């Protein structure tokens, strides 16, 4: 009997090993080869699949080489930031794919196809990449389907026009603190050289802390510092090939990331619970910031339906707060730094922007209506977002065979919508596509794009960035206050080195020389 049990046990073990081996073999070889054949039959081309890693090794080598030295000011930035994508498209055309490990990633560059993908968010969902990024933020940006619709509905009130007007004093205060520091630096000699990037990052982080948490501003700043450390650790981790389960290894970095996640959750939960108590006590001041507006919207939805399932849990509110930090700070600080760099290069546009700001406000405090009438500044910001979008691409995955125009796509492929390649496409924007020319937006985005989905720095469709108007308002306020007080040029020590780590940033900072106007 004992022998029979041993034989059965051994047989079961062999079956498990065979099944596991078959699944692995199918995952790393059979399925990729099947998908490759399918895509080639649909007119897509790319490198032949290479076992397990696909094109990842080549991508890492090319990125390392591209980032090893700066480029000239007027060089094409595409080979530096996405060298493999450029190589694939140069070799195989726009209908091409590359391999992210055993998964094919298909370039989608037809504006009609992009419109379809970004419109049908139930069919085309965000893929699950490195799970470490969830430590940074999830919230509405990570949600799908009905869950996304619920989160979006509850967050929308925080970004209505009237609510944005109420946030302008906080934006002004944070901007004022930075320009005052710069005035002190410049005052002795009339000019001063500095790296503006860390100051702009401080400005945008302070704006988020004030507008998201209001009276809990100092607590918000501490949370933001933890989130910045978390982002740096995740960036370090993302520079290596991720293997499933790596986040569970007891490394120093993994331990610290878990500690930060725990600290942030405890701190945010404390702020949220205080706000809930204040709301119950009928304190109006608790409704004035992003968190207060979100909690009020959440409370109304629950009361209306008489069911907590229609609202967000405290943990879900925490994730939305983390998203406020990450998306709100990164997007606007990058927009501001590239705006200052490009206006340093193009003094004619800096002069036009300065004249418009001084004509509108003089040396007075910028107001909401005036900011919305800054046509030249708006054109400049739109052009900066075209040339230096915060996010280089969007990706989506499909879980069943889908028709996209005349093309069929199999389940399991990742669709890559390369924002920056569309923004630099000469077939779309003309021969000057790689040049800084805000005039192209003189009649607005719709006219510039001829109504096609070829410009989407904040995404497009139902899932367009909920905070885009907030980001643009903040950028206009900051630039108006900077242009009122300073002119600026590139420092000889400035090294032009755009690189993408989560967002598109200047690798060596932004060294400018400020000159006082006052």
Swiss-Prot record:
Stretches that traverse the bilayer:
2-22
Q: Does Heme show up as a keyword for this record?
A: yes
InterPro entries for the chain: Cyt_P450, Cyt_P450_CS, Cyt_P450_E_grp-I, Cyt_P450_sf, Cytochrome_P450_Monooxygen
- Which sites bind heme? 465
What Gene3D superfamilies does its record include?
A: Cytochrome P450
The EC number of this protein is 1.14.-.-
Role played: Probable heme-thiolate monooxygenase.
Name the record gives this protein: Cytochrome P450 CYP72A219
Q: What species is given as this protein's source?
A: Panax ginseng
């Amino acid at each position: 009997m004992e022998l029979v049990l041993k034989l059965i046990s051994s047989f079961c073990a062999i079956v498990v090993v065979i099944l596991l081996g078959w699944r692995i073999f199918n995952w790393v070889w059979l399925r990729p080869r099947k998908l490759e054949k399918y895509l080639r039959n649909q007119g897509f081309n790319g490198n032949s699949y290479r076992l397990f890693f696909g094109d990842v090794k080549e991508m890492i080598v090319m990125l390392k080489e591209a980032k090893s030295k700066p480029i000239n000011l007027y060089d094409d930035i595409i080979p530096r930031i996405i060298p493999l994508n450029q190589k694939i498209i140069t070799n195989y055309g726009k209908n091409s794919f590359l391999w992210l490990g055993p998964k094919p990633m298909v370039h989608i560059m037809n504006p009609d196809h992009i419109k379809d993908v970004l419109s049908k968010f139930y069919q085309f969902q965000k893929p699950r990449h490195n799970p470490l990024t969830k430590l940074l933020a999830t919230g509405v940006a990570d949600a799908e389907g009905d869950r996304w619709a619920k989160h979006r509905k509850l967050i929308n009130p925080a970004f209505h026009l009237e609510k944005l007007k109420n946030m302008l004093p906080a934006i002004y205060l944070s901007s004022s603190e930075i320009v005052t520091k710069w005035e002190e630096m410049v005052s002795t000699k009339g000019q001063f050289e500095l790296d503006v990037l860390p100051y702009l990052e401080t400005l945008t982080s302070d704006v988020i802390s004030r507008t998201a948490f209001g009276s809990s501003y100092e607590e918000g700043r501490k949370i933001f510092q933890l989130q910045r450390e978390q982002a740096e650790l995740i960036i370090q981790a993302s520079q290596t090939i991720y293997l499933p389960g790596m986040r569970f290894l007891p490394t120093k970095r993994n331990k610290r990331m878990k500690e930060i996640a725990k600290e942030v959750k405890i701190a945010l939960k404390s702020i949220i619970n205080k706000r809930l108590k204040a709301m119950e006590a009928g304190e109006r001041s608790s409704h004035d910031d992003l968190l207060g507006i979100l909690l009020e919207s959440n409370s109304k939805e629950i009361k209306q339906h008489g069911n907590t399932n229609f609202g967000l849990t405290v943990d879900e509110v925490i994730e939305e707060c983390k998203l406020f930090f990450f998306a709100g700070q990164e997007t606007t600080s990058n927009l501001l730094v590239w705006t200052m760099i490009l206006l340093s290069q193009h003094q004619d546009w800096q002069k036009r922007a300065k004249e418009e700001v001084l004509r509108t406000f003089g040396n007075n405090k910028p107001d909401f209506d005036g900011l919305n009438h800054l046509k030249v500044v708006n054109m400049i910001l739109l052009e900066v977002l075209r040339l230096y979008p915060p996010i280089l691409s969007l990706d989506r995955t499909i879980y069943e065979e889908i028709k996209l125009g005349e093309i069929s796509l199999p389940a399991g492929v990742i669709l890559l919508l390369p924002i920056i390649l569309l923004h630099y496409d000469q077939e779309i924007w003309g021969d000057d596509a790689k040049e800084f020319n805000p005039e192209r937006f003189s009649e607005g985005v719709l006219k510039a794009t001829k109504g096609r989905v070829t410009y989407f720095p904040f995404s497009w469709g139902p899932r367009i960035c909920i905070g885009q108007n907030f980001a643009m308002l903040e950028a206009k306020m900051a630039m108006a206050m900077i242009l009122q007080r300073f002119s600026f040029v590139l420092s000889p020590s400035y090294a032009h080195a755009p690189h993408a780590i989560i967002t598109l940033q200047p690798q060596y900072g932004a060294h400018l020389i400020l000159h006082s106007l006052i």
